[in-house]
Amino acid sequence: MRTLTIRTQRPYNALIAPGLLDRAGQEIARVLSPCRAVLVTDDTVDALYGDKVLESLHRAGFDAAKFTFPHGEESKNMQTYQQLLDFLCACDLTRKDILIALGGGVTGDLCGFAAATYLRGVRYAQLPTTLLAMLNSSVAGKTAVDLPGRKNACGAFWQPSLVLCDTAALDTLPEREISNGLAECIKHAVIADAEMLPLTRLPVADYVELAARNVAVKERFVSQDERDTTQRQFLNFGHTAGHAIEALSGYQLRHGECVAIGMVLAARIAQGLGICAPDVPAAIIQSLNAARLPIRC
C-alpha cells in the first residue's frame, strides 16, 4: 500500500492499494472515530459497492445511512444538492458526524460541496472508484455543483479528512473510462513529471504506482497553492477549452476526453506564440493517441 500525505492547512492521507473498499470502515475509523455517517453514491456505483461499503461502516461501529442519486454529470446540480441536504437533515447529521463520497468525480464534487456547506462544514472522506477521480478530483479540495450553462459555478474549497483509492475498483471500468483518467495523467506528465508517461502503458492491475505518482504531482501543487491563485493553476492545463467542449457536447464527451482536446489546442497556441518547444504538440498528441484519447472535436 502507498500512503501519501496531502499537506494542506488540514493535512490528510491518501491511501492507495487494491482491496481498500473491503475494509473502508476500518480505515475510516482510524482517522474519524465512529459516529453517524452518510454514504453518498450514484446508482451505478451503488450496485457495485454500495452495500459492501455500508456493511463495512456498520462493522466498524458507524451508524451509517446511504444517499443514492442518478449517475452522470446531469445530476451535479442544485436540485440533487438540495435533496442531499434534505437527507442530511432527515438523518439529523451534526457537525460531529461525517459524509463519505463513494464514486467518481461527480459524486466527490457533490458530496464535498454538501460537506463544505452543511452546518458550515462537516468532515468527509473520499472513496474514488474511477481512475480520473483517483488521479485528480479526490485530492484537490475543490467541490462544486453546476449551474445552468456553467460547470462548477457554485462551489467551495473543502479538503477531505481521508482518501482511499482502491485500485481493484478499476477492474470494473470500461476501456473508455480508463482512457478518460489517463488524460489527467498525461496532463500531469506534461506539466510536472514526464518520466511517468511510460506508466500509462502498464496493465490496469499495476496502477498503484501510477496513481501514487499522480497524487504526488497533485499534492505538490495543492500544498503550494491550496486556493488556486498561483501555482495550482498549472493543473488547469487543457481545461480552458476542455470545459467549453464538454458543455457543447452536452456532456456526451467525458471530462478527460475534453481535457485531451484542450491540451492539444493549448499546446498549438503556445507553439504559435513561440512559448513552447516546436515538438511539444506532437509529443502530446503521440501520448494521447497511445491512450486512445481524441485530439480534435
Q: How would you label these PLM feature ranges?
A:
Residues 31-32, 92-94, 117-119, 146-147, ...:
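Solvent-exposed alpha-helices and their adjacent loops that cap or buttress functional pockets
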Residues 71-72, 102-104, 237-238:
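Glycine-rich beta-strand-to-loop/alpha-helix junction loops that act as flexible
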Residues 85-99, 111-126:
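Non-catalytic interfacial helical region
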Residues 198-297:
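Active-site segments that bind and position negatively charged phosphate/pyrophosphate groups
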Residues 106-113, 134-135, 244:
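Short glycine/serine/threonine-rich phosphate/pyrophosphate-binding segments
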Residues 1-98:
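ATP/NTP phosphate-donor binding region
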Residues 15, 113-202:
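A glycine/threonine-rich phosphate-anchoring loop and its flanking beta-alpha core
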